[in-house]
Amino acid sequence: MSKNTRRPGETVSERQVDPLATEDRFLTWVVGMSDWMKGNRDFGLIVAFLVMLGGAALVYYMDFKRDQINQAASRLESIHQSITISALEDAKAQLSTFVERFSGTPQAEEATVLLGRLHMEDEDFLVAISVLESAGLSMGTATGIQANSLLARAYEAQGRWSDAEEQHISVASASDLDFEVRESLEAAARIRITQRDFSGAIELYQEILEALADDDPRRGIYTSKMAEVAGSVE
């Protein structure tokens, strides 16, 4: 009988499927996987070690940042105390060192504002500008807005009218506090008057009035200022 001749009653599946061969293939796969796992055991240990090392590094970093912030808060409090006893020059030196050491922390931003303010009080306007510009604090935080408002006043004190006006208006746009917006717009209006931009000053006073309630007593103050400036235009 030819090997391709099918016996009566024998189906194709019955003739082709070999249960023993299928089992052999499965056992071969299991043995192969077992051998691979044994051969790559060191690799698996390395991966596990790296995962553990990464987790430990993350925990260390979080602890480090927490300790840094705690140290910064404690150190800044100590500097505040030195200011209250009038050791101002020493306080400035300590604040400068503090800003460098704790750069990137909220306390460093607060120290920058404090250092800039001390230089402003001593009329060291150029130094104040250098400190505040170097910090480059964003107006996305309350401390950043304070720093930029202080920088605007330092520009103004140095007669940098264009920079001061632009900075005051930027602070007014960024702040959510009514008094900061009002003070910044009023400062910008004052600069425009100095530069004889009377119509520009009136525009800023008008913007202040629009933000005040109809019964706000301060409306009379700004209305009078507008009238005074309008008289200068004539």
Positions of the model-derived regions?
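N-terminal positive-inside, membrane-proximal cytosolic segments immediately preceding the first
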Residues: 2-49
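TPR-repeat structural position
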Residues: 88-89, 125, 161, 198
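Short solvent-exposed coil/turn linkers within tandem alpha-helical repeat scaffolds
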Residues: 101-108, 137-145, 172-181, 209-222
